[in-house]
Swiss-Prot record:
Keywords: Cell membrane, Membrane, Protein transport, Translocation, Transmembrane, Transmembrane helix, Transport. Its main location: membrane. It comes from Rhodococcus opacus (strain B4). It is a single-pass membrane protein. InterPro entries: TatB. Residues 97-143 are annotated as: Disordered. This is Sec-independent protein translocase protein TatB. It is found in: Cell membrane. The Tat system comprises two distinct complexes: a TatABC complex, containing multiple copies of TatA, TatB and TatC subunits, and a separate TatA complex, containing only TatA subunits. Substrates initially bind to the TatABC complex, which probably triggers association of the separate TatA complex to form the active translocon. Belongs to the TatB family. One of its GO terms (biological process) is protein transport by the Tat complex. Gene3D superfamilies: 1.20.5.3310. The keyword Protein transport applies.
Amino acid sequence: MFGNIGWGEFMVLLVAALVILGPERLPGAVSWVTKSLRQVREYASGASQQLKDELGPEFEDLRKPLADLNQLRGMTPRAVITKHLLDGDDSILTGNFDKPGSVSFDKSNPGTKAVSADPSTPTAPQNKPLAAGERPPIDLDAT
């Protein structure tokens, strides 16, 4: 209910309520607000229960289309294309064309490779760190 109000705004509202209502009327106002919220909650739950009672088994038939609509509300254009046109494969959109068994680069930690579980995939030999003053080997094919 108060998802869009941060702590700073909430504190400003409390200080404003204290200044406007004063310390003697503030507890009464807080109790009135809590009673009102409880009453609204009871009305809402009573209305939903009354709807379930009146519709009976048809209520479940109504819930299915509503659940489908609720699922579509969170869909972005990219998610719709991925789900319906690409069968869930978003490699075209993300550019990640690695196969599940291949070695892929970890984007969160540059310079490291993810280890694959496939033993047939060849791996590069592990390089030892260079000693102080040692020059790195030169690859003549790369230069």
